[in-house]
């Protein structure tokens, strides 16, 4: 997909749009594309602190928004982390062991899954959209190349939009422009934007160290590394292990 193809799929609107920005690769590149399409004054990003292990991603989200010159709000959602801690490896303090990419291949519900996270985050963002008279909520949800969650599919987004359409006074539509793209295709869009330098302000790792370096072995890292290699560029973020980019 080229940028022009993406822009043609995005709605034309005179209202502001909201981006659900985790600080990860998908939502960050999507936010860059939204700014290029609508302008920095029309895009507002929302990030959620739900007790995720990779809390540094919120810092990365703030850095990216500063570089892009857009509004940014971090919303406290600690109760979700409290609920998910016993069963999700993705929550700080959880005793659930972090799986590797080999552990999750073919698993319909990996241990990194946070129960109903995307439903909750998107519902809150739709509420913010209605309160601020925004027309669209954009999410970087993507069907992963090697594994997937039930709440990252286009079917999931379509179902939420069907519920939201019952709102009698304010119509808000959720859009997931990357839902059918691979991460390699997303990176290609960033290359076309000539903003790969901004990817230093992203974090995909589920288990970064205290210095913010990605582990390089969790499912999210493995997929990110694989797709940067497919795109034939070096990932600018630091890793705890040596990555053979030139092989």
Regions found by a protein language model. Name each.
Residues 123, 204-226:
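Local cysteine-cluster metal-coordination motifs and their immediate loop/turn environment
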Residues 145, 228-229:
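Glycine-rich nucleotide phosphate-binding loop and flanking beta-alpha elements
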Residues 194-208:
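Glycine-rich phosphate/adenylate-binding loop
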Residues 230-247:
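Short microdomains enriched in Cys/His and/or Lys/Arg
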Residues 157, 186-190, 199-202, 215-218, ...:
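Short amphipathic alpha-helical surface patches that serve as generic macromolecular interface elements
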Residues 1-196:
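ATP-dependent adenylation/nucleotidyltransferase module used to activate substrates
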């Amino acid at each position: 997909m080229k940028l022009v193809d993406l822009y043609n799929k995005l709605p034309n609107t005179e209202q502001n749009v909201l981006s659900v920005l985790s600080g990860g690769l998908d939502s960050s590149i999507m936010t860059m594309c939204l700014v290029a399409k609508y302008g920095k004054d029309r895009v507002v990003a929302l990030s959620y602190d739900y007790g995720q292990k990779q809390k540094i991603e919120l810092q990365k989200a703030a850095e990216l928004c500063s570089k892009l010159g857009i509004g940014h709000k971090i919303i406290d959602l600690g109760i979700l982390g409290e609920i998910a801690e016993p069963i999700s490896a993705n929550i700080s303090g959880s005793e659930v062991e972090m799986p590797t990419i080999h552990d999750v291949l073919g698993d319909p519900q990996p241990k990194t899954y946070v129960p109903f996270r995307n439903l909750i985050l998107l519902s809150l963002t739709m509420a913010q959209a209605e309160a601020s008279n925004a027309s669209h909520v954009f999410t970087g949800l993507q069907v992963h190349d090697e594994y997937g969650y039930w709440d990252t599919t286009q079917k999931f987004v379509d179902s939420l939009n069907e519920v939201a359409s019952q709102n009698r006074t304010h119509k808000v539509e959720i859009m997931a422009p990357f839902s059918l793209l691979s991460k390699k295709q997303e990176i290609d869009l960033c290359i076309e934007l000539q903003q790969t330098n901004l990817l230093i302000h992203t974090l995909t790792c589920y288990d970064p160290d205290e210095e913010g370096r990605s582990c390089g072995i969790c499912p999210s890292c493995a997929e990110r590394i694989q797709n940067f290699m497919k795109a034939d560029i070096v990932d600018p973020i630091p890793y705890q292990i040596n990555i053979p980019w030139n092989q």
